[in-house]
Amino acid sequence: MLRTHTCGELRAADEGKKVKLCGWVDRIRDLGGVRFIDLRDRYGETQIVCDVNSKAYSVVDELTRESVVLVEGTVRKRPEGTENPNIETGEIEVVAERIEILSLADPLPFYPGETPKEEMRLKYRYIDLRSERMKRNIILRYRISKIIRDYFDELGFLEIETPFLTKSTPEGARDFLVPSRLRPGKFYALPQSPQLFKQILMISGFDRYFQIVRCFRDEDLRADRQPEFTQVDVEMSFVDVEDVLNVSEGMVSRVFRESSGIDLKVPFDRIPYDEAMEKYGTDKPDRRYGMELRDFGYAFETTEFKVIRNVLDEGGSVKGFIVPGFASEMSRKKGEELMERMKELGLGGLIWFKLDGGITSPHLKHLEKEFRKIAETENMNEGDVCLIAAHTDRNLLNEALGTLRLEIGKEHFSHLAKGFDVLWVVDFPYFEWSEEEERFVARHHPFTMPVLETLGDDYTKVRAKAYDLVINGYEVGGGSIRIHRRDIQEKIFELLGLSEEEAQKKFGFFLEAFRYGVPPHGGIAFGLDRLVSIIAGESSIREVIAFPKTGNGVCLLTGAPAEVDERQLRELRIRIEEG
């Protein structure tokens, strides 16, 4: 080894030792007859002292920031009053006898700890990863992964690898396709998840499986998504919903406790899907902001206000929420901004009033009676604001109000976004309508066990034995009890519009396995990137991934995706069409 110690290791007890340190030059200070170097590696920082009479003194003239050097010297205590309590090695310094330049650095486009635009950080990721923030996040990610592995190992789970080159089963997002050179015209797909393989492992008798695995989705990247991501994949045989939730809560609570000293309240709260949509307008609720959605229909039963009357006469709904202490912010201009936002979200507009020395509203002339009833029923206080909307589509109304609630919470009540709001959303509908495909699709995936009592030809009534873990408004995990009976699986395919021939073509290998003994089983997958980002306090998962892609799926470090050699394309019998 070139070094005897790391830059975060030496203490006062090491005084007098001859040591060799290697690292990056973080800072250089020249105080005349003595020069100081702050030498840094991933373990910490050590102050190097170069006296004017030492051979090391002149070498400092050649050094630049971020050069890599080897330092030989002797440990001594810092003079009294010069200790640095902000670093672990702050009691000591190393008096340099020799400095060897291992790699001289050119001027950098930016220096560790600086925060240029994200594109620059991703292009020069090797510089960005030297910062304390990124170092802390990457080490945290490793520790969380180790905690997870230890937890499942103690419970008797086996970590089993599943294939990356598999068959395309186009359900949900698009697959990344990999052409086969040996079988022209045939393609592998990179897995969106190991779903079928982990179920086959249950059929194979491996009753407790987990894997920290890369997954791939070729989808239009919404905010803070990655085309390749890491999930903690879990599957168990002979279990019901309670078993999966208990094991999951044990893992998540242990990760928080051992990685960050945070104790979560176990068991986690559970909210049925319908309740989440009614109260928060989303199946990923963040309850820290309060402001639950309320049904204000009771106040408008006899209203003559035309806009709302028409909605109610058509069977629609009137809902809204109270924003506490928001009156000082709620000017007419702010009201107009919120009204425009609701139109963007698909509603006709917004009605509002506030308690500000009495009821104040642009709509007071027409709705004073209704406003007073709401204020009394909801026990509104001076300074509160009530936001109200109406629509014939209750789902759209809930979603629009839920979005507005969250936007107001994040913009004006960020001080409430502390701690961790952890909950399960359960009792999901099995199907949802896809506008793009103009048909019902499985909300989770078509291998989820339905609640048998609800299984019939009415898509809207079928419920799934599915569950999502939500932390601070982010979906961190999702899973279900799986179908283990072939007749039920065929019924689900039928409801999804898959003919027997199509089902065999896509999933024949899987359905074949159903003939030979399938245990009841269930599982869950956690998004490791999201889990780490929440614990790290980062708003973007890119901050906890060593080499992430941009929002449009580009690796700025390597330039991927990129053109390939024409010869490679010919071997694969692929031709690129222009336009």
Curated annotation (Swiss-Prot):
The keyword Ligase applies. PROSITE patterns: AA_TRNA_LIGASE_II (PS50862). It comes from the Bacteria. The lineage of its organism: Bacteria, Thermotogati, Thermotogota, Thermotogae, Thermotogales. ATP binds at R217, D218, E219, Q226, E475, G527, L528, D529, R530. Homodimer. It holds the Pfam family tRNA_anti-codon. The record marks G81 as: Important for tRNA non-discrimination. This is Aspartate--tRNA(Asp/Asn) ligase. It is an enzyme of class 6 (ligase). One of its GO terms (biological process) is aspartyl-tRNA aminoacylation. GO terms for molecular function: aspartate-tRNA ligase activity; aspartate-tRNA(Asn) ligase activity; ATP binding; nucleic acid binding. Belongs to the class-II aminoacyl-tRNA synthetase family. Type 1 subfamily. It catalyses: tRNA(Asx) + L-aspartate + ATP = L-aspartyl-tRNA(Asx) + AMP + diphosphate. HAMAP family: Asp_tRNA_synth_type1 (MF_00044). Residues 195-198 are annotated as: Aspartate. It is found in: Cytoplasm. L-aspartate binds at E171, R217, H444, R482. Its EC number is 6.1.1.23.
